[in-house]
């Protein structure tokens, strides 16, 4: 496992903003170098002096990312990044993704045996649940057992229907030893980031997915939930004054509805937002703004429902649809050139595990016509409302397909509804936009190409490939870096040959913020989505 992580991290660029500063009624901060990505080694920004003020910022306001992402507990939250982030404000895990590797969190110390099978975690002895009950190793043990019967949203305790944990031993009130069923490179993340729940609450709950007790949002995290409105997607969190770990940077975190994030940012209504490609130059030149690059972190896929449209079970038809799409034009029109045509093997070209040895599907409308015109396909095209760019991309897809004889009807829904329709298979083709493209690929490959239809919003209806499923399933057990690269190369080749889904374009995107207002943003090693990293909400984490 150590070799696997080391290889990935050595090839990835990690951006971390280590100094934390800001302004509120009690103090001021100094901006980082404006118009550029923040310097990972910078410590020039003024940090909050605990003697002068308790928090870097009184209220940190962020966009709600387009809607409701579920209640922030392990059984109610959306598995998209914004949903998981809100849950992780409230419910802590043993470990946390740090800038370079996993770091201690609820566990004060931890170790792994040389054979990668035995994990020992010793908890912070002063950790408390939000109702002031102590957190103990028995809560960790209970969480493992409870999730075995009631899987948490996005949980990874099971691989191919078998638990990754063989057994555990609680050796004292604050120490648990977990024995893995087999050595997997993914065990550290899957075990370490499991949200821990309080035994004294959930042991009396038979149906956690519908439980509505007043204590359903009691965790031991850095923040407590103050309010949540599913109708507007609004959330407010308050700093946990009894928190055992890092110092919360904001007194309150508010997620607010926004119709236009750029306008909201300009008006000072939110502290951070992505910047569209057409506005990048203007904002990068401003002295009061810092930019964070997120290279190929986000991208679009076109999902194909082969059960609803049996003609698409023919790979020649799928290839024709792919060739009908002018993806270079999509990069130019949607991302103003700040992006890439996605690989048919899914893994983007900026990912260290990318393989160029995949089937290429260049734009060829005439070849597509020969296959598609005789079929007379009529497709119901479901899209979301993630970003204004999505409507633009959908229109380009529609135009390209209609130019080769495919009739397309576009239906637009809010993000949660679109995701629900993806899970249930309520579409012919569906456009989805998500992050995680540039992380180590195994998690996304498992979700997209080895999942079960009806259980995940990522999976293709009407497609299965046992060889690919077996290959992806073997990847977590590979610790040799050369063998790992070979396995990823083979998986990408199979995916590009089968093209059960059509990766379209990936985005070289940027987030922007005002360092003088809030400068605590951090990157986790497996993602450049700064707003989704727990460390971004602490004022005392040092890189």
Per-range role (PLM):
Residues 8, 340-371, 387-390:
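Structural transition elements
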Residues 61, 136-143, 173-177, 222, ...:
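Alpha-helical secondary-structure segments
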Residues 61-114, 145, 218:
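N-terminal lobe/hinge region of extracytoplasmic solute-binding protein
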Residues 64-85, 106-108, 133, 187-196, ...:
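A structural "hinge/loop" feature
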Residues 81, 192-248, 542:
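Gly/Pro-rich hinge or "lid" segments in bacterial periplasmic/extracellular proteins
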Residues 111, 158-204:
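Surface-exposed binding/hinge segments that line
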Residues 240-283:
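Ligand-site clamp/hinge motif
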Residues 324-353, 389-398, 423-543:
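Detector for C-terminal structural segments
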